Amino acid sequence: MIDHQNPDGSWYYGTQTHHRWVDNFHTGFVLECLFDYINFSSKFELRSNLKKGLEFYQDNFFLADGTPKYYHDRIYPIDIHSCAQSIITLVKLDSVSEQNQELKDKVALWTLENMQDSDGYFYFQKKRFFTNKIVYMRWSQAWMLKALVTLLISQKEFTEKTSKDRVGTSHILSTS
C-alpha cells in the first residue's frame, strides 16, 4: 500500500489504468487500515505516510461548510457513503490531527441537514440538479447508522475522559 501512495499523499482506487481515480470512501478505508497497521505492528516510521494521506484527504475531499466530496477533484455526486465514511475516518484518526475534531462535526451536521429526509432516512446521492432519494439499506442507511453511532461513542468517550480529568472520577457520567 505504501508503494502505491502518490506523491501528493493520495491513493488511486486500483492499480489498473482504468482504476486511476481517487475517491473519498476508499481513501478513508486506506487511511483507517494504515492507522491500524501502524498501531498493531509498531511500524511508526509509516506515520509520515499516514499524515500525508490524511492531509490530502482533509484538503481535497471537503468543502468549507463540511460537504464531503465523492472525488477529490469535483463536487458531484455527493454520495451518502462518502458522508458516512468521512465521519468514521475522521473519528478514527482523531488522534492524528486536531483538524478532525471540527471537520467531523461539520460533516455530520451538513449530512443531517442536506442528506436526511424529514422521515429520518438518508438519501442515496445529490447530483448537481436533482437528489436521488431511493432508500438503500446497505449503501445508505447502514453506513449512516454506523457513522452516527461511531460519532456518538467518540463524543461520549471524550466527555467521560474530560469529566474524569477535571473532577478526578470516572463515575460522573453514568449511563443508568
Enumerate the predicted regions with their spans:
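Glycan-recognition and catalytic cores of secretory/periplasmic carbohydrate-active enzymes
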Residues: 1-176
